[in-house]
């Protein structure tokens, strides 16, 4: 039976019987922590628990935390620290944007297993591609800070610098 908890501001769910090993499951854009259930069904019998969190702005989170790396990465680092206090062995299972954020949150940390699906590994290249599609130069983005583009997204100089 899943156990619903909160780690800092992050809603989380823990799957599996107590174990010495745990995966952090980080969903992608428009996902949610419950996506971890299928993965947990595979690894729980192998002696791994699965802890999954909702990224900022997902699954009804209305706590004001935005899905930007300077807010999401420290939140995932807090989850990582929570895990290090409770499990001897850590793994990461992450999807797309969640993979990029998780890799930053776990930089320099020992991870026994790292399973990434459709990982976004080069955020800078992706943002530069979106700039080109929108016909926006880096100089204009630097000057304006943020520029809304078709499709409901906003290009951000701060985000590009972070990447």
Give the residues covered by each predicted segment:
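The serine-hydrolase catalytic nucleophile loop
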Residues: 29-41
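Short beta-strand element of the alpha/beta-hydrolase
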Residues: 20-28
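N-terminal cap/lid segment of alpha/beta-hydrolase-fold proteins
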Residues: 1-17
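The alpha/beta-hydrolase serine catalytic core
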Residues: 4, 89, 109-163
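Catalytic nucleophile-loop/oxyanion-hole region of alpha/beta-hydrolase
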Residues: 58-86
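Conserved alpha/beta-hydrolase
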Residues: 40-62
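Gly/Ala-rich beta-loop-alpha elbow adjacent to hydrolase catalytic centers
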Residues: 94-102
């Amino acid at each position: 039976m899943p156990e619903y908890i909160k780690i800092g501001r992050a809603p989380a769910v823990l799957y599996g019987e107590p174990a010495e090993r745990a995966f952090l499951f980080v969903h992608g854009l428009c996902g949610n922590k419950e996506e971890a259930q299928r993965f947990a069904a595979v690894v729980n019998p192998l002696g791994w628990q699965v802890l999954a969190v909702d990224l900022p702005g997902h699954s009804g989170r209305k706590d004001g935390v935005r899905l930007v790396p300077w807010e999401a990465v420290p939140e995932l680092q807090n989850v990582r620290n929570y895990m290090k206090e409770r499990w001897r062995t850590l793994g990461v299972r992450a999807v797309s944007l969640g993979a990029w954020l998780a890799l930053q949150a776990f930089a320099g940390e020992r991870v026994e297993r790292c399973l990434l699906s459709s990982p976004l590994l080069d955020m800078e290249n992706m943002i530069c591609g979106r700039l080109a599609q929108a016909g926006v130069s880096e100089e204009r983005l630097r000057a304006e800070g943020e520029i809304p583009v078709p499709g409901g997204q906003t290009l951000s100089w701060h985000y590009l610098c972070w990447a």
